[in-house]
């Protein structure tokens, strides 16, 4: 269940709550008291002062309460996504000081003890600041610590000697030696909760997980596992490890009583524990109101929920006295006779017919899509009028200005659609269609509408894709690349068409993408997908070379076989040139001369000098001629006689 509250934290006493919400397209930081001033159940004290961030690109990534020893005042440390750490004074409602890390990497988490402030950024660098002198003391990196999300200080007297950091796994860092001392078993998803509950134990939880692991800092063993009924969002403990309260994703609150005390008598008992108490808040009409944060201290429990979308309300409970399943019934509409005690955003106008309720106002990043349908209908009317104009025959000057490419494109369109169109109408139609696709794409990305996004991505015209991305806002190009990476990773058969969108996003908005800090973490899915696919390129090229080599060998063999077959008819033509005279054979003039002549022809094929050599021929009765000259004379005589 998504909450309008992006960040929230109670002060150490539980009397104030700091929370971060969104007003239009900018974040704002507010602080509200948690105690009721009257017995009527209405919070009469309301702080209307908010710290509005100047730029819509600035985001608060983490926050901590701090008691400044130099001025003896309470302040709030805000970690920003631009690499700065702001010191926000609640009383003055202004930022009194800004720490800087020297780069623009996002601050992931902060923790402080005494006058020391520790933080980590998205480049996995550690920073130590002095809150008295307001300066940076040191910064360093550790090789084995990457993709860090959470940081907490392990108390050791008044000094800080060790740190706990977590990504998917948890590591214990020695500050002096700057190395990993111990590694604890981690979670499948990134760690979102990391707190030290005593000097010997700490607790950790992950995103989208309903399990909390309690570890022994010194031995590294798992003490117990706390199991909630739903995914855990926020955690609060009493400081003595006798009670832990968690808010879950379904809007309930669960309390674990004495989580470190083993109730099993077996030596190898089950280490998992379920919650002892569960609290829910419902309205009088039966609707469930989600709890987004809570603070537990000894016997007192303070729960907070939202009304009118962004207005926090609080209630104190004696949690030890309530039953295991407890439901708090509240009224969402207060009938207050004292209008000065009204908890609406800016009070109520008695002369107004209806009162403004902020929860009914839906604003998404300052863009109003209310008139998108009307705009699309107007564009469709324009397209209809353009098609009517295109049906008219073109003028003479238009025909003269058309190039060969224009005529070719017009003929192609006419062949497909069966209508003749000129270049002017075609360009106007394409431009209007591109504008419509851009509006639909922007709406789909901002509203996270996957079905609407699929209708846009089904477009295969590269020119329309290029013009659409050219008109797209650079900030939305990052979201588009993330959506494309998800589809390429899941649907490999769509990689070709989707690569066209990725290509033009990188070409057109590449300059903006380079200026974004933490680009690797933002587009990590796209980077891993493309890298995994590009790793196959050398193997595919090697396979292509082998296939080319094999095909060339087959072509060579076929060519040689063709030459052999083509040479056979030539030999037959040479044999056809030999004349056979039947009359000479019948007259008995040729007995063995023909054979001698045939043998001479065979020997002449081997060498030009074989005409002068002697040769013998066998007769049918097996006798051999002793003198070759007689045979040659007979052969010559037969030729002369023939002439």
UniProtKB/Swiss-Prot annotation:
The lineage of its organism: Eukaryota, Fungi, Dikarya, Ascomycota, Saccharomycotina. It comes from Saccharomyces cerevisiae (strain ATCC 204508 / S288c) (Baker's yeast). It is found in: Nucleus, Nucleolus. This is U3 small nucleolar RNA-associated protein 5. WD repeats lie at residues 14-54, 55-98, 186-225, 227-266, 340-389, 471-511. Residues 565-643 are annotated as: Disordered. Present with 33100 molecules/cell in log phase SD medium. Residues 612-626 have a biased composition (Basic and acidic residues). InterPro entries: SSU_processome_Utp12 (IPR007148), U3_snoRNA-assoc_WDR (IPR052414), WD40/YVTN_repeat-like_dom_sf (IPR015943), WD40_repeat_dom_sf (IPR036322). GO terms for biological process: maturation of SSU-rRNA; maturation of SSU-rRNA from tricistronic rRNA transcript (SSU-rRNA, 5.8S rRNA, LSU-rRNA); positive regulation of transcription by RNA polymerase I. Its main location: nucleus. Belongs to the UTP5 family. GO terms for cellular component: nucleolus; nucleoplasm; rDNA heterochromatin; small-subunit processome; t-UTP complex. It comes from the Eukaryota. Interacts with snoRNA U3. Interacts with MPP10. Component of the ribosomal small subunit (SSU) processome composed of at least 40 protein subunits and snoRNA U3. In the absence of snoRNA3, forms a complex with other t-UTPs. This complex can associate with pre-18S ribosomal RNAs. Keywords: Nucleus, Repeat, Ribonucleoprotein, Ribosome biogenesis, rRNA processing, Transcription, WD repeat. Residues 570-611, 627-643 have a biased composition (Acidic residues). Involved in nucleolar processing of pre-18S ribosomal RNA. Required for optimal pre-ribosomal RNA transcription by RNA polymerase I together with a subset of U3 proteins required for transcription (t-UTPs). It holds the Pfam family Utp12.
């Amino acid at each position: 269940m998504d909450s309008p509250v992006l960040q929230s934290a109670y002060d150490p006493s539980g009397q104030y709550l700091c929370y971060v919400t969104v007003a239009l397209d900018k974040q704002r930081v507010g602080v509200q008291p948690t105690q009721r001033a009257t017995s009527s159940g209405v919070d009469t004290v309301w702080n209307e002062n908010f710290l509005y961030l100047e730029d819509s690109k600035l985001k608060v990534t983490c926050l901590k309460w701090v008691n400044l020893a130099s001025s003896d005042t309470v302040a709030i440390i805000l970690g920003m996504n631009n690499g700065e750490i702001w010191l926000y004074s609640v009383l003055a409602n202004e930022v009194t000081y800004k720490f800087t890390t020297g780069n623009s990497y996002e601050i992931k988490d902060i923790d402080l003890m005494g006058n020391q402030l520790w933080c980590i950024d998205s480049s996995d660098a550690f920073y130590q600041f002095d809150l008295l002198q307001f300066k940076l003391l040191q910064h360093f990196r550790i090789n084995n610590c990457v993709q860090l999300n959470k940081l907490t200080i392990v108390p050791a007297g008044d000094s800080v000697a060790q740190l706990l950091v977590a990504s998917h796994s948890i590591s214990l860092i020695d500050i002096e030696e700057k190395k990993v001392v111990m590694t604890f078993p981690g979670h499948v998803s990134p760690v979102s909760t990391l707190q030290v509950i005593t000097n010997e134990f700490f607790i950790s939880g992950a995103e989208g997980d309903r399990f909390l692991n309690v570890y022994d800092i010194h031995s590294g063993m798992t003490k117990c596992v706390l199991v909630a009924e739903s995914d855990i969002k926020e955690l609060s403990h009493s400081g003595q490890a006798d009670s832990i309260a968690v808010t879950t994703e379904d809007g309930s609150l669960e309390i674990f009583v004495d989580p470190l005390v083993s109730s099993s008598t077996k030596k190898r008992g089950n280490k998992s524990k379920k919650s002892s108490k569960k609290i829910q808040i419902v309205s009088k009409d039966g609707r469930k109101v989600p709890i987004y944060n809570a603070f537990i201290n000894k016997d007192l429990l303070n729960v907070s929920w939202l009304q009118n979308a962004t207005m926090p309300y609080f209630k104190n409970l004696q949690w030890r006295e309530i039953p295991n399943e407890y439901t708090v019934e509240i009224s969402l509409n207060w009938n207050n006779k004292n209008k000065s005690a009204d908890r609406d955003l800016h009070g109520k106008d008695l002369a107004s017919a209806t009162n403004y309720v902020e929860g009914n106002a839906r604003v998404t990043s300052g863009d109003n899509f209310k008139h998108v349908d009307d705009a699309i209908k107007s564009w469709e009317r324009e397209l209809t009028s353009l098609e009517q104009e295109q049906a008219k025959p073109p003028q003479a000057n238009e025909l003269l200005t058309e190039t060969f490419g224009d005529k070719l494109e017009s003929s192609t369109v006419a062949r497909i659609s069966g209508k003749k169109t000129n270049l002017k109408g075609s360009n106007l139609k394409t431009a209007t269609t591109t504008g419509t696709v851009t509006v639909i794409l922007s709406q789909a990305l901002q509203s996270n509408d996957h079905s609407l996004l699929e209708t846009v991505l089904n477009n295969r015209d590269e020119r329309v894709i290029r013009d659409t991305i050219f008109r797209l806002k650079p900030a939305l190009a990052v979201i588009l690349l993330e959506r494309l990476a998800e589809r390429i990773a899941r649907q490999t058969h769509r990689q070709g068409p989707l690569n066209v969108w990725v290509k033009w996003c990188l070409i057109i908005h590449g300059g903006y993408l380079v200026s974004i800090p933490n680009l690797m973490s933002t587009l990590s899915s796209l980077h891993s997908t493309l890298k995994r696919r590009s790793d196959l390129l050398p193997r595919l090229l090697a396979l292509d070379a082998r296939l080319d080599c094999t095909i060339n060998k087959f072509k060579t063999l076929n060519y040689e076989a063709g030459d052999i077959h083509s040479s056979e008819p030539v030999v037959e033509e040479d044999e056809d040139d030999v004349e056979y005279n039947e009359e000479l054979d019948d007259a008995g003039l040729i007995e063995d001369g023909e054979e001698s002549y045939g043998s001479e022809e065979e020997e002449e094929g081997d060498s030009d000098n074989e005409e002068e050599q002697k040769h013998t021929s066998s007769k049918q009765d097996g006798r051999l001629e002793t003198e070759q000259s007689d045979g040659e004379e007979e052969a010559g005589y037969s030729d002369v006689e023939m002439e």
